[in-house]
Amino acid sequence: MRGSGTLRGVNEPAIRLTGLRKSFGALTAVDGVDLSIRPGEVVALLGPNGAGKSTTIDLALGLARPTAGSAELFGAAPRVAIREGRVGAMLQGGALLPTLTVAESVALVAAAHRNPLTVTEALERARCTEIARQRVSKLSGGQLQRARFAVAVVSDPDLLFLDEPTAAMDVEARRTFWRSMREFTEAGRTVVFATHYLDEADEHADRIVMMARGRIVADGTPAEVKAVVSGRRIRATARFAATPESQAALAALPGVRTADRRGDRVTLVSDDSDATLRALLAEHDIHDLHDIEVTVHTMDEAFLALTETRATEGALS
């Protein structure tokens, strides 16, 4: 990485997106995104397919023209930072020439930069040494992703964008990739990676920016994002009649955020499960409730709660 004292825009955010919007006809893919990322942060863009993650990365890189708003990298237009070799990218559609070997592909990109890593260094960083002589056309999906990573880091960038970097990788390949990534970020580089793997965002990001329907619906540390959907889920089989009055009584129990009944199955989401259970058992005879269970939210449930509920709330506000 270049000496930070000589870098243009050293006091600027690594990424600044302001009022960013991108529409394709009637479809709005990115809807008013404001985002500032400091140098040295490792940030996960988390969201379901169609959330706007890839389009946001394209806009940040200057690969697409925004309908409204602006994108800056290190205080300058994206093309400036890219031309200076300060930005690397590993994109889903990043094509490599099928007739070249992995080493030749890395060398081709290295030749376009002023102060690249050596080809050997880039291959080692991406754990590609053993496939260096293989042609791109012969690579498996996971190997191809590693080759793309080698190409992305050969410029020795200060900022790296990764779009679904572990797609097509098996579990062991994913572990190997993230070991490489930890080595890359140890020098204080900035990394932004888009993913739908909840465990990757939780384990490897300093900060999670969650998107849904083109909007940011949560932004914070992994712990802060998960805390937004804190609480427990209480399920029970109910023998008492399902009436509007009984439903209202369930919803009014202390700590309850949502109350749902389908047939004889009652599901409550509570911020204080102990208080909810005490009140529930006080209001109903023990014989009216069976198969009571209390569970914590799974990460999948947290993800769904934020990407569905928050996006809807944002659209209505």
Where are the model-predicted features located?
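Catalytic Walker B motif of ABC-type/P-loop ATPase nucleotide-binding domains
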Residues: 160-164
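Conserved ABC ATPase "signature" region
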Residues: 107, 111, 116-131
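Short, charged/small-residue-rich alpha-helical element at the C-terminal edge
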Residues: 231-310, 317
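Conserved ABC transporter NBD signature motif
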Residues: 69-83
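ABC transporter nucleotide-binding domain
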Residues: 178-270
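Conserved catalytic motifs of ABC-family nucleotide-binding domains
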Residues: 156
